[in-house]
């Protein structure tokens, strides 16, 4: 998702964005800004997304652990009622949990 803005400015009709399940309004707003040519607005949204992306995709590509971190972020933001994950995936703990919590709070949830 760090490449979302860069991809959109190349010209797209849409995209499949997993992160949109967490922040659909912001992803749509980013797309709208790009379509209108409001690159400053788009950059502002991208900068807002970045700490959340870093907390969720801490170790790179999406994985079971990244999905668990996404669920925790969605739970902490009030978008999910539960953050239950199935084995063998584990919920984030310790510093990983704190990083997600800080990012969610920093985003204003």
Locate predicted features.
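Catalytic alpha/beta core domains of metabolic enzymes, predominantly
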Residues: 1-53
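Short glycine-/small-residue-rich flexible loop motifs, especially phosphate/cofactor-binding loops
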Residues: 4, 71, 101
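Alpha-helical structural signal in soluble globular domains
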Residues: 10, 33, 73-76, 103-106
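Glycine- and other small-residue-rich loops at beta-strand/loop junctions that grip anionic moieties
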Residues: 19, 59, 89
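Short, flexible active-site loop motifs that bind/organize anionic cofactors or intermediates
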Residues: 32-33, 60, 87
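Shared catalytic-loop signature of beta/alpha-barrel
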Residues: 40-79
């Amino acid at each position: 998702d760090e490449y979302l803005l860069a991809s959109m400015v190349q010209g797209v009709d849409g995209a499949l964005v997993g992160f949109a399940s967490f922040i659909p309004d912001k992803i749509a707003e980013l797309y709208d800004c790009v379509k209108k040519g409001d690159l400053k607005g788009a950059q502002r949204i991208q900068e807002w997304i970045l700490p959340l992306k870093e907390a969720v995709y801490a170790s790179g590509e999406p994985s079971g652990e990244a999905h668990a971190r996404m669920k925790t972020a969605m739970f902490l933001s009030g978008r999910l009622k539960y953050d239950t994950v199935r084995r063998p995936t584990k919920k984030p703990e310790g510093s990983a949990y704190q990083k997600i919590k800080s990012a969610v709070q920093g985003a204003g949830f």
